[in-house]
Amino acid sequence: MNEVIKWLIEGPPWVEYLTRIGLLGQQESDLEVATARHRMLIQPEIKNLLSELSEWPGPALKRHNDAGHLLHKLVFISDLGIRVGDTGVDRIIKRILENQSQDGAFQITANISPQYGGSGRDQLVWMLCDTPSILYSMVKLGMREHPAIHSAARHLVSLGTDNGWPCVVASELGKFRGPGRKTDPCPYATLIALKALAQIPEWRDSKPSIRSSTDTLLKLWEQRKERRPYMFAMGTDFAKLKTPMVWYDILHVLEVLTQFPHLVKDARLIEMVNIMKIKADEQEYFTSESTRKAWSNWEFGQKKAPSYLLTLQVHRILKRITGLSLY
């Protein structure tokens, strides 16, 4: 067995579980997988997250890169493989389904300052920089065939253009819009929209506009010295490895784009992959280069030692690129 895999399996239960299914290709029915998953579900950290999420939608979101907000904790638990039927998950899903707009978008509570065109009040609304993440999480949690998911996906696709997703918000937010030109795609909205739709093959594989939107993100990488739509730069901070995947950075972009098979040999994508790869240490482990205060108690919330979760995430991306089961 590869030495990296041996090390990952010694890590937290969620890393062992994801390593076994994502890198080793083991089945959910395998005893080792089932054991790791059971151990994951009884960990205090996981129980605490599920308890917090039971109060969805929780406190108002005031900035979309708030890594401690329930929105990002929802994405995190869904990425771990937690799903319908696990203790506490059905209540979370019920709360999310109760907060879906008439047009299909899942809603959160947000508070937009009047300085940015908002009301300064807590409102149940949606924006294209949050609702795709809820759709993504719901699919990952095992709700893909639910009518609410079909409605949310149709709504999301309807807002896309040939070059991505613009800054669009619920009508209740009035004139609020991000700091960019109206005709520009929002890099972050485009990223998380693609992330959600990549989980639904019938959408991922059938819409030319989705394929062209993946190219938009690669063009932004090509033109990173000239273009910064909606103030999303792709410089030094963008290239720092950090997890959880909350904002617009190299790990998040690669995690999404490598889920589109037609891109895996694209030179622009490979350039980003190579920038990521050279950050490995001699053992092929990866260490966080930037951290998020809300996650400082987790093993990836420090910059001094290699992170199990970050190392897993990088090697999972590399496996998609090589197409090899080399573990």
Residue ranges and their predicted role:
Residues M1-Y327:
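Preference for long, amphipathic alpha-helical scaffolds in soluble/luminal domains
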